[in-house]
Amino acid sequence: MAIEASVDRATGAIRVHRVACAHDCGLVVNPGMVRAQIEGSIVQTLSRTLFEEVAFDRARVTSVDWQRYPILTFPDAPQILIDLVHRPHDPPLGAGEAAATTVPAALANAVFDATGARL
């Protein structure tokens, strides 16, 4: 996975422009659905990594509504390029969740590339 991002030096805001993902899931039975699973996993993980937070006080969760809960919105979603590694002689493997594991590391590398600083 590779991510292209920029960082606003004044605010520290990170903007992800493009994500490229090569994904090996063995026999690809339904390529369109596999791509949709991977795209959803990437967008959800970018949102968790960049914005999402459950806030607490001393006694309870204070994040109680979705209106103020920060998530990645459609206008902020990056272009996502997916290359499926099709291995027709192998059994089908997982498609969606595996893409999530590499997003935070690829994002950290993109921030390093943009700023020269490690998170």
Where is each model-derived feature located?
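C-terminal catalytic domains of large/alpha subunits in multi-subunit enzymes
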Residues: 1-119
